[in-house]
């Protein structure tokens, strides 16, 4: 124990706030989700899990530290029942994951969870910028009983983030560093010059044209005898490293007394990405790199015996430099995949990039084109006062707070053009260099920026008291927030009131009523507010006399809830209830040459526009046995109505006006969630296992779609965003096969082209033959498995994550050969030829006239299911007397690997989540953590 005076504490905390240090605390703890002694937060009140009636799942912040991720959302894979997480990009600073609560419940534009950070509304952009080291707990509120207090923001679920705060114990300092390397997972393999040229000739032959490359050229490509005139460039290896460094470091201080409690954090991450950073890049701009620094100070002060004040100051500083002309690395990846390996050498001569008028030089795009600078800043400042009103009546308290959030992004463009050179032979056989483009100076601007600011005010009156066998808790809440963006001149405002009351008799029988009354300025003044009620009941059977104290059944609880919540994020334009007019040209009266401006009616107003409404029903059970085995299950059914929809089947097109979107859409969403946990201790051994399963299936009930001649063309009755595609049934074998098959209208077909099924039997393959196929890339099922074990100082942890009932679609250059004069990947090696007609896995090659084969069809779809080992960590913790004498609590050393492997159906072509663009990465890191 370190004992010190208040002045010394203040000095150390001040120093800590100014110091930077480095990553990866290894301690992980996770609150038992079913323990009667565990507590979960509802705004400004606390409810024990034994009395909790809503569907709420949670994860402790320390459990999110192990996976090496700079984006908080990417630490949540398989961690929270009901939370669906999907990542489609591995680029540092652009690797945001998508989050859904209980899947997708609407086909409207607003599908995102409502984010609440420390009791105040926030956004997913803010959430992604948080560091795992500053998180105390993340909770997902799922049913109406848990979310109704958020009113018209609750339909998609609410994600509650609680940051760490101080304690009344002596100062604890936590310092850690982790460094390692990252490598790409499953990048496309593009063919070398010889294979590319051979397949190019084959594609020409399929079109009845003469070959472009003769035998001498093919032999030169094969042997590499003349790399200048017959180059063979692996652009992937020229531009990207097999390994690149990463670093993460953190420093926290936590402690306090009965009077002052504090938590201070600094966390920094650095990533230089997978691109090579040649020294030549320094002349024309920045090398690729991404960094982010998080800071936080949370302080709680007891001003009087009854009054406490809480202060929050937090934020992040993010900087990213991307070579080239785009903020995203996608352009560099696309350029790399567009240039054939035999197009030109990397350099025509020293200091002279190869290139021609058709293709840019990928390496020069990386090193010669300048850079885009991206700078992001987030800030949160909040203060909350809480007064104990026990002098009025026991258990009464009043809390009020104000919060300011700022999210700012700026972009600086510093780009240039460069000369590139094509090698050729003149008539005398001399080597000449034909120049395309010219070298220019760096130029650009710094005028591009975006900003979001939010001011929120909240006040809560809470009551919590026990009268014998009767326990009553209640709260009333007022909240207001005002948001402004750089792209809009008018603010976005929300105002609401909430009320909740919970009654428990004898710790066995429970009833709860929650409600919200919320308004949003996007709706008509006469219909701006809505009432969102919910009710829940529960029975803790384990507290009945016949089960109490039996030693086997520690908890057995049934619960059920039903209620109505809303979603004000409906999309469309603002203030749709207003009628707007637009310029309609000039009208000439009489013989005058001067016309009068006219105005015509724009899209019709919708005076009844309103929010989406979601009727939620939830039934659940929580079980804990022998103080080591826990189980919970939930079944839910949601009916979303009043989804903003284009009224294609309501108003005929010949009406002559643009109709407004109407609140007439309906979607059902049903599913189940299961959680099973086990933990144990024996002598020096300890172990734990926790598995979660989430299933959510949606169905469009009504979307006002236009009538179709064939019912299978309707989206109604299918999942939201149901893909419609042609059904591929093989390849045409010969001309006789073509003549005897339905006519495909997408272009002339020849043997080796994809053959489609005639769904309606009319002898023609056209738009009427597109049918519902598979799922979307958003999974319907999620699986998580967290395994841990330890012996004395050793520990090991594994995190598995699976996603099922998902379909992915392959498109673009990595999968479609010669697309837009691009290159060819190994994906096309199984192409159709007369000799491989029975075993071909890819259509015949062609340079032009390939429109038939690139139709959206089942040929290009793949089963997107996967099971990944997301995280593996092995460590050892030192706790001996020598460390204690040095006032060191413990030191931990550990090895961590993220994205260890994936079991999927992609046959090694690509990662099932990151199909194209910047690849997913595997990170191997070593770290140490010291606690004082």
Predicted regions and their residues:
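Conserved small-residue
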Residues: 174-227, 325-326, 681-777, 817
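Extracellular/periplasmic, surface-exposed regions of secreted and cell-surface proteins
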Residues: 25, 298-309, 313-317, 326, ...
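C-terminal extracellular loops and terminal segments
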Residues: 79, 659-668, 707-726, 772-784, ...
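Short, solvent-exposed loop/turn motifs
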Residues: 121-122, 353, 357, 431, ...
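Outer-membrane beta-barrel proteins
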Residues: 62, 124-166, 186-190, 230-250, ...
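Extracytoplasmic gating/loop element in the C-terminal half of outer-membrane beta-barrel translocons
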Residues: 212, 339-348, 803-893, 897
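Glycine-rich, aromatic-lined ligand/substrate-binding cores of catalytic
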Residues: 776-809
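Short, small/polar-rich motifs associated with maturation and membrane association
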Residues: 1-295, 309, 760
């Amino acid at each position: 124990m370190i004992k010190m005076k208040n002045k010394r504490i203040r000095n150390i905390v001040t120093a800590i706030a100014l110091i930077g240090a480095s990553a990866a605390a290894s301690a992980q703890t996770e609150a038992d989700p079913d323990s009667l002694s565990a507590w979960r937060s509802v705004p400004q009140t606390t409810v024990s899990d034994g009395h909790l009636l809503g569907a709420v799942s949670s994860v402790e912040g320390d459990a999110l530290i192990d996976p090496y991720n700079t984006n908080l959302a990417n630490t949540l894979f398989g961690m929270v029942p009901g939370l669906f997480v999907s990542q489609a990009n591995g680029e540092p600073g652009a690797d945001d994951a998508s989050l859904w609560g209980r899947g997708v419940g609407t086909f409207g534009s607003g599908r995102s969870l409502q984010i609440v950070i420390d009791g105040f509304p926030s956004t997913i952009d803010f959430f992604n910028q948080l560091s795992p080291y500053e998180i105390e707990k993340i909770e997902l509120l799922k049913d109406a009983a848990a979310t109704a207090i958020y009113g018209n923001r609750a339909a998609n679920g609410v994600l509650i983030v609680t940051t760490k705060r101080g304690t009344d114990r002596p100062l604890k300092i936590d310092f850690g560093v982790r460094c390692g390397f990252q490598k790409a997972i499953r990048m496309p393999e593009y063919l070398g010059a010889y294979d590319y040229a051979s397949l190019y000739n084959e594609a020409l032959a399929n079109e009845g044209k003469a070959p472009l490359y003769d035998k001498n050229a093919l032999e030169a490509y094969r042997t590499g005898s003349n790399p200048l005139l017959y180059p063979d460039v692996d652009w992937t290896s020229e531009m990207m490293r097999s390994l690149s460094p990463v670093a993460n470091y953190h420093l926290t201080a936590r402690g306090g007394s009965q009077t002052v409690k504090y938590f201070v954090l600094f966390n920094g991450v650095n990533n230089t990405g997978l691109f090579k950073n040649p020294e030549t890049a320094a002349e024309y701009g920045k090398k690729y790199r991404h960094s982010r620094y998080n800071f936080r100070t949370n302080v709680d002060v007891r001003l009087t015996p009854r009054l406490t004040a809480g202060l929050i100051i937090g934020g992040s500083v993010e900087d990213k430099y991307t070579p080239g002309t785009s903020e995203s690395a996608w352009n560099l990846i696309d350029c790399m995949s567009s240039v054939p390996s035999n197009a030109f050498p990397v350099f025509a001569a020293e200091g002279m990039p190869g290139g021609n008028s058709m293709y840019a030089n990928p390496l020069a795009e990386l090193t010669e084109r300048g850079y885009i600078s991206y700078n992001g800043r987030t800030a949160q400042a909040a203060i909350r006062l809480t007064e104990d009103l026990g002098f009025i009546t026991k258990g009464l308290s009043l809390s009020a707070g104000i919060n300011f959030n700022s999210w700012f992004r700026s972009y600086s463009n510093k780009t240039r053009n460069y000369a590139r050179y094509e090698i050729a032979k003149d008539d005398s056989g001399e080597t000449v260099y034909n120049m395309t483009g010219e070298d220019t100076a760096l130029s650009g601007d710094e005028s591009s920026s975006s900003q979001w600011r939010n001011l929120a005010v909240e006040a809560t009156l809470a009551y919590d008291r026990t009268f014998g066998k009767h326990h009553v808790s209640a709260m009333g809440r007022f909240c207001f927030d005002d948001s402004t963006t750089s792209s809009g001149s008018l603010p976005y405002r929300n105002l609401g009131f909430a009320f909740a009351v919970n009654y428990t008799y004898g710790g066995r029988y429970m009833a709860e009523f929650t409600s919200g009354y919320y308004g949003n300025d996007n709706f008509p003044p006469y219909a701006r507010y809505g009432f969102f009620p919910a009710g829940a009941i529960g029975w803790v059977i384990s507290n009945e006399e016949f089960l109490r104290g039996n030693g086997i059944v520690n908890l057995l609880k049934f619960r059920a809830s039903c209620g109505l919540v809303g979603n004000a994020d409906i999309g469309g334009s603002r203030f749709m209830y207003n009628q707007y007019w637009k310029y309609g040209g000039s009208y000439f009266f009489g013989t005058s040459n001067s016309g009068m401006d006219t105005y015509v009616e724009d899209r019709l107003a919708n005076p009844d526009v309103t929010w989406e409404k979601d009727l939620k029903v939830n039934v659940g059970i929580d079980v804990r046995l022998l103080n080591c085995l826990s189980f919970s299950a939930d079944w839910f059914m949601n009916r979303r109505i009043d989804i903003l929809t284009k009224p294609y089947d309501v108003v005929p097109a010949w009406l002559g006006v643009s109709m407004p979107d109407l609140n007439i859409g309906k979607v059902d969403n049903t599913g189940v969630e299961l959680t099973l946990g086990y933990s144990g201790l024996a002598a020096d051994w300890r172990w734990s296992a926790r598995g979660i399963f989430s299933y959510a299936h949606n169905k469009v009930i009504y979307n006002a779609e236009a009538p179709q001649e064939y019912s299978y063309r309707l989206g109604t009755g299918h999942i939201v965003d149901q893909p419609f595609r042609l059904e591929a049934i093989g390849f045409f074998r010969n001309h006789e096969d073509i003549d005897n098959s339905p006519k495909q209208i997408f272009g002339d077909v020849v043997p080796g082209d994809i053959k489609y099924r005639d769904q309606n039997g009319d002898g023609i393959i056209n738009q009427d033959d597109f049918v519902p196929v598979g799922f979307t890339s958003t999974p319907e099922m999620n699986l998580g498995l967290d395994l841990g074990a330890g012996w004395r100082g050793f520990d090991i942890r594994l995190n598995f994550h699976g996603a099922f009932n998902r379909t992915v679609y392959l498109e673009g250059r990595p999968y479609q050969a010669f697309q837009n004069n691009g290159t060819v990947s190994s994906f096309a090696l199984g192409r159709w030829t007369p000799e491989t007609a029975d075993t071909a896995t890819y259509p015949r090659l062609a340079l032009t006239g390939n429109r038939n084969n690139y139709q959206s069809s089942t040929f290009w779809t793949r089963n997107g299911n996967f099971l990944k080992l997301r995280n593996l960590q092995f460590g050892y913790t030192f706790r001996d007397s020598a460390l204690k004498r040095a006032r060191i609590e413990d030191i931990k050393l550990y090895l961590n690997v993220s994205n260890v492997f994936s079991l999927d159906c992609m046959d090694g072509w690509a990662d099932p989540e990151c199909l194209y663009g910047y690849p997913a990465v595997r990170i191997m890191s070593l770290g140490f953590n010291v606690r004082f």
